[in-house]
C-alpha cells in the first residue's frame, strides 16, 4: 500500500497523524509539499517539492491567492502519476475507484 499526502506547508497536524499510522503499518509514504524542511517531508519515505507558495508563506511566487498554485500543480502531477501507475499496473478506472481511499 502507498499513502500519498499533499500539504503545502508540510506541517498539517492531521496529515502527520496519517503519516505516522501509515509508517506503523509498513506502508510506503510520499509527500508533496512546498517546504522541503517540513516535518512531513522528513517523515516520508519519498518527498516531492513543488515550487509554489503555500497559503502560509509570505513570499509571492504567483499572483494567485494563498495555496492555489500549489493545489493546481499537485492536481496535474498526481493525475499524471495516477494515469502512469494505472497503465503500468494494468488497472482500469473501475478497479482504481474501488481501491481509492480519501482520508479527509
Where are these regions (language model features)?
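A short, charged, Gly/Pro-tolerant segment at domain boundaries
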Residues: 80, 86-104
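Glycine-rich phosphate-binding loops that contact phosphosugars or nucleotide phosphates
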Residues: 1-76, 82-83
